[in-house]
């Protein structure tokens, strides 16, 4: 805008200057430059790429960029990070001369992102190639911290450690590699070399046998193990003035190792003299390292540590193709097998897992992050709470110091001199705590060089003595611990020795940066400033000396000397120093006491005094109960004005002892027993004791516990800390109780310094546990389950104590308290501990229980301060009408401690018991914990506070109990699912009570949808309250009321709705006592949990799915369904035990029983049918029981109903229950033989139903009430006028309902048929309810004018004028008959209206319409009735199907557009639904009637389709299964009737139609023929069983007359398969089977006779035949002879046998001694082949049936035929004596082949030729083999595929003994 204004400015004469580019434009320019640099790098133009990337780093916008936090996603810092990484790549490509620049780039990049393991890998690789093994090791270790599974860093670190020579670390890394890859060859080799102890003497051992080697690492100076001795020999042969050593890394440990290796006599360097000057060469010059550090400090700003590590956006924007991160396993195992690599990659975890926990970050810092703001401001020191790490030097600074020392001491006299200088240098320059390894090396070097000719300076001796003493504080740190004090004594003695020799003490202060020489010291002798310095340093030196001497005296148990030494030290520190500053002496190299002050010395002196008092005075005072005096005596000594950190706790063999700890324990006991309690001293005691224990455990140190430390000792210290934390909790409870009793709750209950100090120490405890235990679950998953329970408990106790300490301050706001609980909950949840731990009562979830109690007390306090009723409601659904007293009562019930048993854990002394009692009192009065002081806040702040409390409560209850009241989605923030969130498995009844009281207000105010959310919780509670107490169940008044057989329902039903009915039925419910007495008994039996019992079951019943209709069909019929119904009803019955007058429970219970009856009958009608229902009596019993219980529940509901609508509804339900018992429906009744008996019970139910419908109608006039009353009037036999008037009233109340219209005119039809055509009164009544008004007028006119039955006619008859009387009576009869027809047609017309249009599926009216037509009996009425009802049983696709649909009153049909008769334009629609059982009943009733109509109309085809369709119908086959035989009987009856009518007309029976159908029916349904013949619908002479079987024999005879061999074979096979089971056979069916077999046999004989050649053979022909068959003269041929007795049979009708004989005798009479020389003629070959197969089937399948034995077969010579010698017994004639089936098979075989063989040969041939051919392309037809003359050659058999076993010993029957035909 400014530029535009400047351009448009025409008046200004000055030239405008453009503005600077925006920050976004500059960032874009830098991104583009970075992109160009990447392209140049990709193109290998390294110089240009270097120029571009350096320009990015030098840009001012990059150098001046600042961010607040490291997590801030800053584009510029991403760009800077990537530029540094790629610039390092450029330097690497430029060569080794640029390696230092690349190193600097990597160091700067690491400052930006220290979590990039790939970057650490590059840095380590580069520094290794430069010889910087220390930096390389550091880099690879940091890379593993970032990514613990990084193979690159792991393997490279192993090689660097080999190069360094660190054997212990090398073995650890090798084991780490083997844990991830057990077959790693290099790691196995390294581990074997290090652990190998069997090497030869004087040979390299352990790590000395290894050389570093890695494909991607370069080592500048590899150790030559094999050439080492040769080099040493070479150096020993010539004099050398200086020995050079290569320092692998610039560290104290490396330098000390070289010196020790020279001076130690057992080292391999024994050949080198320790007095030869040595030169130490560094791998990298000090200048380069220092320069790199300076460059780093110059380039990297203070905000560089805040750079975000996310660089993916830069990569996308720049579009560069340079890959920023290399793969973890890239080219690391070139010789690895593919299968091994795949397995390794499959088991590899994603890289993200390595970054989930930042190992470089102290995990305990989260404690301060969460809780720092909640520590009271006074006395809180962040360093004391969370930052406990001693300052140690980093590798780079140590590298610089070591390098400086080496450079300064190049001129030396050998190893001894170098070691002496080194010890002096460290003693003066040490400003940090030395590592353990460095300290041990220093002490070892000191021992080796102790007796060198030059003495140590006193400062050096004092330094060494302090170092030895510091190690003695942890005796387990060094193997020779007892010798430490000897060494301390030695060095102190050396100091005295040097002083006694007047050795000038070097006064150079240890804190200065340079070391003074002797000459420089002398130059300061005359200067005043130097004198002051000398005075201070001298005092400092001797103060340190006397302090150490005092400590040594205490260890020697010389306390007097120790006191003397302390006083001397105090005198030195007490003198005035330089200026006014307090005297402070630094001891930076010591771990424990790092500084000496006056307060420290005074504290130690006080401890000596306390020790004296504990040994002499205190025990006697405690014994005499002088508790206050003890407190006054010890408190000033233990608690001086300024607090002192503890120095030591003495460790003995028996355990841990300390004078201070002993004094504190005595003082604590005295405070507990003194009256009143000195709160400040009491709390200070616990604060100081916890402080001493924490410092004794070493929690203030960051040094890793060495491997040689004693685990038992550490555990004992931790146990003491945990016990003290528990004691602090008891202390807080006692202090609170004491202050509450004194009435000082309005003031500060404890000193803020004391409270803040304990809070800081508790934070320290929590931080220590997090640092040393909980962090392991992230860094080492194997230890995730190894966290000790004591650590968890201690952590939780510390958190609870921290929170309770805050509550002691009355000035803390309520919001502050709630926020602290929320923070602590989040913190505990982070480590999965929010639900862990046990409180004093042994209940799980100690913190959550404490939090819930406090939050509910706070909530009550806040709500009581709100005057408006709107403020009372919880956000989770408390009703607005809930008053303040109810809220208070609810909260108190939740918070009252239920467990009064405090004897679960025995106390060690009386004081602990007293503390437990007071804590119990405090827990019972939690609601008083909130101070009366209430802040004046705005209404909005109160609402916000309320919401905060509710959210905290919701989360606590969700974690502890699994409660989630927020599933409705109305809350913005969902509840967090923590690691150990409860799933609602409550362990005790007390837990259930707490939860239930919490949710009760919400549940009462919720709808069913809200209760569904609580279903899981309510179920969990019910596990502990599964049923009421046993004494209530034993005398269960509800069950007795529901099942009492002596209860008179009729009386109750009569009194229902009257005044006093509730009292009457209550007496029936509780007969022996009053309602008040019953409630008192409930209180006595369920007192502790009465509220739970009183509400649980009702709420659970409302939340559960109590309706079985939602289950799968038929569910209620199963055992599971019965149990489901019982469980649901039990819930309401249990509730009614405690709330006997709850209307909702009675009503719902009655509905459940009614629904069970409905489902039982509906599902029973569909899934069991009538027959199955009769077999299961238990189902009928369930129906009757549920009906009775439903009626009684509804009667009780009626007594409790208040409004008229409720009473009307209950009356209607009761009436329907009674009415349902009256209906003749399935599955109780089958509409055929089983019908309801209209006995006294039936009549009583009718009357009760009528009564309740009448009462319901009086409350609310509903058309259905009048409708049912009309039907009941008909059942009770009331006058026609009453029932029709009810229907008329129903039609008036609901003009659109079709139900009353249908029922009105259906009843009129029934009455017209029942009363007859001459009942004047009935006709008059029926005429008044005509559908058509014109017919009504006509009928009434005729009835009014008729003379039939009038008084005048009767008078004439009395006077004797009979002829006139008869004439007038006949005329009246005709008129009445006309009226009857008019009314009948009117009713039919009305029913026709009920099935028009969209009401076409209103099947009730259609059935009544068909019934009316059928009963009218007109000429075409039968056909019309069938056509009308056929709508329900046919469709456009099928001639018979059940085309009916269940009437549903909920779905309103469309309105008719066509007006009805007489202008009736009412739009009728269905209003009453139809039950499934009623629908199935209608189907059955209509089906029976429709089958009758089909039979009477002789519709055979539809009947045939009917019974087939009924069996296969998927929907209704089971429902109408018992009606299928009825349909078959109707079908058979129709067939028989049809044949009888044809026979009477003289026609011939057609076996292919009716007879064939009867036979097919016999095959399919023959087993039920006896039942069919005895059905009432089919019983008659024409359908008797014998008559039906006669038709079967006729069918067989017809087939035999027509010689249908194939058909006879088929029916034989069907009969054999159908009746092979003896149970399905009877005498009639057996006769049919024998007849069919005989007919098949005779048909085969006739067919064979028809194709057998009959021409005679002359002698010439006979002789001519012989040569053609191989010139054999004895060839025999088959001769066939049939006898005349062929047609005689014992079970056939003689007339039928005569018919067969007359037809086939001429054919069979020709077969007399016929010789078969050749096969049949060509035209009959196919027939012969078919007959051969049929004979073979007859041979296989024919059972033991008596067959005609008049078939004779012979073998004869051809020459005997002309001579007439073919007689049995003659020479050359052999009789074939086999069975008839075998004879037929031989006969057919001979006709087909022209020759005959043995029976076994024929059978074998048939077996092989009737099997399927397996060979591809083989023909399926039989091949007739060529037969040579005389029969010597047999047919070649086909390949045998399947073995077939032929019965009747087929191979045993031979045809003769002729050799020409072998078997």
Swiss-Prot record:
Biased composition (Basic and acidic residues): 894-923
Protein role: May be required for replication-independent chromatin assembly.
Organism classification: Eukaryota, Viridiplantae, Streptophyta, Embryophyta, Tracheophyta
Places the protein is found: Nucleus
InterPro entries: Hir3/CABIN1, TPR-like_helical_dom_sf
Keywords: Chromatin regulator, Nucleus, Repeat, TPR repeat
Assembly description: Component of the HIRA complex made of UBN1, UBN2, ASF1A, CABIN1 and HIRA.
Protein name, UniProt field: Calcineurin-binding protein 1
Free-text disruption phenotype from the record: No visible phenotype. The double mutant hira-1 cabin1-2 has aborted and fewer viable seeds.
TPR repeats by residue range: 30-65, 81-116, 118-150, 543-576, 602-637, 866-900, 955-988, 990-1009, 1011-1031, 1143-1183, 1226-1263, 1264-1297, 1306-1339, 1377-1412, 1508-1541
Any one Gene Ontology cellular component term annotated for this protein: nucleus
GO biological process: chromatin organization
Biased amino acid composition, Polar residues: 1818-1832
Alphabetized PROSITE patterns for the sequence: TPR_REGION (PS50293)
Tissues where the protein occurs: Expressed at low levels in seedlings.
Gene: CABIN1
């Amino acid at each position: 805008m400014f530029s535009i204004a400047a351009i448009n400015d025409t008046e200004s004469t000055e030239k405008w200057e453009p503005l600077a580019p925006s920050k976004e434009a500059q960032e874009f320019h830098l991104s583009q430059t970075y992109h160009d640099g990447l392209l140049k790098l990709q193109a290998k133009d390294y110089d240009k790429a270097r120029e571009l990337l350096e320009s990015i780093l030098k840009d001012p916008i990059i150098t001046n960029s600042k961010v607040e936090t490291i997590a801030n996603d800053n584009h510029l810092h991403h760009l800077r990070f990537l530029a540094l990484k790629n610039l390092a790549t450029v330097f690497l490509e430029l060569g080794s001369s640029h390696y230092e620049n690349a190193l600097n780039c990597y160091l700067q990049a690491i400052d930006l992102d220290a979590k990039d393991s790939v970057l650490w890998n590059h840095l380590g690789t580069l520094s290794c190639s430069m010889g910087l093994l220390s930096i390389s090791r550091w880099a690879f270790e940091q890379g593993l911290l970032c990514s613990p599974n990084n193979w690159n860093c792991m393997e490279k670190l192993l090689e660097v450690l080999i190069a360094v020579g660190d054997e212990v670390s090398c073995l650890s890394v090798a084991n780490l590699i083997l844990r991830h890859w057990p077959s790693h060859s290099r790691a196995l080799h390294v581990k074997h070399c290090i652990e190998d102890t069997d090497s030869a003497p004087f040979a390299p051992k352990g790590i000395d046998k290894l050389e570093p080697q890695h494909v991607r690492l370069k080592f500048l100076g590899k150790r030559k193990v094999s050439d080492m001795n040769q080099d040493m020999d070479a150096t020993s042969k010539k004099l050398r003035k200086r020995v050079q050593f290569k320092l692998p890394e610039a560290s104290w440990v490396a330098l000390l190792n070289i010196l020790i290796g020279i001076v130690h006599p057992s080292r391999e360097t024994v050949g080198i003299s320790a007095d030869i000057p040595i030169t130490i060469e560094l791998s990298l010059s000090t200048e380069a390292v220092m320069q790199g550090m300076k460059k780093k400090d110059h380039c990297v700003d203070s905000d560089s540590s805040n750079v975000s590590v996310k660089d993916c956006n830069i990569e996308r924007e720049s579009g560069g193709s340079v890959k920023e991160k290399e793969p973890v396993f890239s080219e690391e195992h070139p010789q690895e097998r593919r299968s091994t690599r795949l397995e390794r990659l499959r088991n590899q975890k994603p890289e993200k897992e390595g970054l989930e926990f930042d190992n470089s970050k102290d995990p305990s810092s989260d404690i301060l992050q969460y809780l720092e703001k909640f520590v009271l401001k006074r006395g809180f020191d962040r360093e004391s709470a969370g930052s406990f790490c001693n300052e140690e030097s980093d590798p780079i600074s140590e590298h610089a110091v070591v390098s400086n020392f080496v450079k300064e001491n190049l001129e030396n006299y050998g190893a001894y001199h170098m070691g002496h200088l080194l010890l002096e240098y460290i003693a003066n320059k040490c400003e940090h705590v030395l590592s353990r390894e460095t300290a041990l090396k220093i002490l070892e070097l000191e021992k080796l060089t102790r007796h060198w000719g030059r003495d140590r300076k006193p400062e050096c001796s004092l330094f060494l003595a302090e170092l030895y003493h510091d190690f003695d504080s942890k005796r387990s740190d060094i193997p020779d611990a007892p010798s430490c004090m000897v060494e301390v004594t030695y060095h102190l003695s050396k100091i005295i020795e040097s002083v006694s020799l007047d050795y000038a003490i070097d006064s150079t202060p240890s804190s200065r940066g340079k070391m003074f020489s002797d000459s420089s010291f002398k130059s300061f002798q005359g200067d005043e400033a130097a004198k002051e310095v000398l005075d201070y340093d001298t005092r400092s030196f001797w103060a340190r000396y006397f302090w150490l001497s005092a400590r040594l005296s205490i260890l020697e148990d010389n306390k007097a000397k120790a006191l003397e030494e302390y006083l001397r030290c105090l005198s030195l520190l007490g003198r005035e120093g330089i200026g006014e500053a307090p005297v402070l002496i630094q001891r930076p190299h010591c771990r424990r006491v790092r500084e000496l002050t006056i307060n420290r010395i005074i504290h130690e002196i006080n401890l000596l005094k306390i020790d004296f008092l504990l040994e002499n005075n205190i025990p006697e005072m405690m014994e005499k109960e002088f508790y206050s005096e003890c407190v006054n005596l010890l408190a000033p000594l233990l608690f001086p004005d300024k607090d002192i950190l503890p120095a030591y706790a003495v460790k003995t063999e028996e355990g841990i002892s300390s004078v201070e700890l002993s004094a504190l324990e005595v003082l604590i006991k005295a405070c507990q027993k003194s009256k009143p309690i000195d709160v400040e001293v009491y709390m200070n005691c616990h604060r100081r004791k916890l402080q001493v224990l924490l410092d004794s455990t070493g929690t203030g140190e960051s040094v890793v516990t060495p491997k040689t430390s004693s685990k038992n000792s550490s555990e004992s210290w931790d146990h003491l800390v945990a016990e003290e934390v528990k004691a602090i909790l008891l202390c807080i409870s006692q202090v609170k109780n004491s202050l509450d009793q004194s009435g000082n709750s309005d003031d500060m209950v404890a000193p803020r310094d004391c409270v803040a100090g304990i809070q800081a120490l508790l934070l320290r405890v929590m931080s220590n546990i997090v640092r040393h235990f909980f962090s392991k679950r992230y860094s080492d998953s194997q230890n995730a389950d190894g966290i000790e329970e004591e650590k968890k408990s201690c952590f939780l106790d510390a958190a609870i104590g921290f929170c309770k300490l805050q509550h002691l301050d009355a000035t803390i706001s309520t919001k502050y308290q709630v926020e602290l609980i929320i923070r602590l909950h989040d913190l505990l949840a982070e480590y999965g501990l929010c639900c862990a731990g046990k409180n004093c009562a042994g209940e799980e979830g100690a913190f959550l229980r404490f939090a819930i109690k406090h939050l509910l007390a706070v909530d009550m306090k806040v709500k009581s301060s709100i005057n408006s009723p709107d403020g009372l409601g919880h956000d989770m659904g408390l009703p607005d009408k809930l008053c303040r007293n109810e809220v208070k009562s609810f909260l108190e019930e939740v918070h009252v401690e239920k467990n009064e048993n405090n004897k679960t854990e025995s106390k060690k002394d009386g004081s602990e018991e007293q503390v437990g009692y007071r804590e119990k009192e405090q827990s019972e009065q939690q609601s008083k914990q909130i101070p009366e002081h209430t802040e004046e806040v705005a209404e909005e702040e109160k609402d916000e506070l309320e919401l905060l409390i509710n959210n905290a409560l919701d989360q606590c209850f969700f974690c502890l109990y699994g409660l989630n009241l927020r599933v409705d989605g109305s809350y913005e923030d969902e509840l967090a699912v923590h690691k150990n969130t409860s799933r609602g498995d409550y362990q005790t009844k007390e837990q259930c009570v707490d939860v239930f009281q919490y949710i009760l207000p919400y549940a009462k105010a919720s709808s069913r949808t809200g209760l569904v959310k609580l279903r899981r919780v309510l179920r969990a509670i019910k596990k502990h309250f599964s049923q009421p107490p046993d004494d209530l169940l034993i005398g269960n008044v509800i069950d007795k009321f529901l099942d009492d057989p002596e209860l008179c329902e009729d009386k109750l039903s009569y009194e229902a709705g009257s005044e006093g009915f509730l009292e009457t039925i209550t007496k029936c419910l509780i007969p022996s006592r009053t309602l008040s007495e019953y409630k008192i008994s409930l209180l006595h039996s369920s007192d502790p949990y009465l509220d739970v019992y009183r509400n649980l079951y009702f709420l659970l019943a409302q939340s559960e799915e109590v309706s079985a209709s939602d289950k799968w069909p038929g569910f209620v019929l199963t055992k599971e369904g019965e149990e489901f119904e019982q469980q649901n009803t039990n819930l309401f019955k249990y509730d009614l035990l405690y709330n006997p007058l709850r209307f909702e429970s009675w009503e719902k219970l009655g509905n459940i029983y009614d629904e069970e009856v409905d489902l039982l009958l509906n599902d029973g009608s569909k899934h069991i049918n009538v027959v199955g229902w009769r077999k299961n009596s238990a189902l009928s019993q369930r129906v009757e029981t549920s009906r009775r219980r439903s009626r009684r529940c509804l009667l009780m509901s009626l007594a409790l109903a208040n409004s008229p609508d409720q009473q009307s509804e209950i009356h209607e339900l009761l009436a329907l229950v009674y009415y349902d018992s009256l209906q003749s429906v399935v599955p109780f009744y089958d509409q055929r033989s089983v019908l309801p008996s209209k006995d006294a019970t039936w009549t009583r139910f009718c009357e009760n139903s009528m009564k309740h419908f009448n009462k319901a109608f009086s409350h609310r006039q509903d058309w259905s009430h009048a409708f049912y009353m009309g039907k009941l009037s008909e059942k009770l036999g009331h006058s026609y006028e009453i029932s029709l008037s009810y229907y008329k009233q129903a039609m008036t109340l609901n003009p659109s309902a079709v139900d009353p219209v249908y029922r009105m005119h259906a009843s009129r039809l029934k009455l017209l048929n029942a009363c007859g055509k001459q009942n004047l009164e009935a006709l008059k009544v029926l005429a008044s309810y005509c559908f058509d008004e014109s017919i009504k007028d006509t009928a009434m006119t005729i009835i009014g004018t008729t003379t039939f039955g009038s008084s005048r006619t009767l008078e004439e008859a009395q006077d004797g004028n009979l002829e006139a009387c008869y004439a007038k009576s006949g005329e009246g009869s005709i008129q009445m008959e006309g009226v009857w027809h008019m009314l009948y047609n009117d009713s039919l017309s009305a029913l026709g209206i009920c099935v028009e249009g969209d009401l076409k599926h209103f099947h009730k009216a259609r059935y009544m319409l068909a019934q009316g037509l059928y009963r009218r009996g007109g000429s075409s009425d039968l056909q019309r009735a069938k056509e009308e009802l056929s709508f329900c049983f046919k469709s456009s696709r099928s001639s018979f199907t059940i085309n009916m649909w269940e009437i549903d009153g909920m779905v309103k049909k469309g309105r008719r557009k066509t007006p009805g008769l007489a202008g009736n334009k009412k739009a009728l629609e269905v209003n009453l639904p139809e039950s499934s059982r009623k629908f199935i009943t209608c189907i059955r009733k209509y089906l029976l009637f429709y089958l009758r109509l089909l039979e009477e109309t002789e519709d055979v085809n539809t009947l045939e389709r009917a019974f087939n369709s009924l069996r296969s119908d998927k929907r209704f086959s089971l429902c109408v299964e018992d009606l299928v035989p009825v349909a078959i009987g109707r079908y058979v009856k129709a067939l028989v009737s049809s044949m009888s009518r044809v026979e009477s007309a003289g026609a011939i029976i057609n076996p292919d139609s009716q007879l064939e159908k009867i036979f097919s029916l016999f095959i399919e349904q023959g087993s039920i023929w006896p039942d069919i013949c005895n059905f009432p619908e089919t019983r008659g002479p024409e359908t008797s069983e014998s008559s039906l079987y006669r038709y079967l024999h006729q069918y067989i005879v017809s087939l035999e007359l027509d010689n249908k061999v194939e058909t006879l074979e088929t029916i034989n096979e069907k009969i054999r398969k159908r009746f092979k089971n003896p149970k399905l056979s009877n005498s009639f069916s057996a006769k049919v089977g024998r007849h069919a077999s005989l007919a098949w046999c005779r048909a085969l004989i006739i067919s064979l006779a028809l194709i057998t050649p009959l021409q005679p053979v002359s002698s010439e022909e006979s002789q001519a035949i012989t040569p053609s068959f191989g010139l054999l003269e004895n060839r025999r041929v088959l001769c066939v002879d049939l006898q005349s007795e062929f047609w005689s049979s014992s079970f056939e009708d003689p007339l039928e046998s005569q018919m067969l004989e007359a037809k086939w005798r001429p054919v069979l009479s020709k077969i007399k001694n016929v010789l078969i020389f050749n096969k049949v003629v060509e035209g009959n070959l196919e027939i012969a082949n078919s007959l051969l197969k049929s004979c073979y089937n007859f041979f296989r399948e024919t059972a033991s049936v008596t067959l005609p034995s008049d078939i004779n077969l012979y073998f004869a010579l051809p020459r005997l035929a002309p001579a007439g010698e073919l007689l049995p017994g003659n020479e050359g004639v052999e009789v074939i004596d086999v069975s008839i089936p075998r004879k037929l098979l031989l006969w057919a075989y001979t006709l087909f082949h022209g020759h005959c063989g043995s029976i076994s040969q024929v059978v074998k041939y048939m077996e092989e030729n009737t099997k399927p051919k397996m060979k591809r392309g083989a023909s399926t037809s039989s091949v007739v083999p060529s037969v040579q003359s005389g029969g010597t050659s047999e047919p070649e058999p086909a390949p045998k595929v399947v073995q077939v076993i032929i019965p009747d010993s087929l191979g045993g029957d031979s045809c003769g003994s002729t050799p020409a035909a072998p078997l």
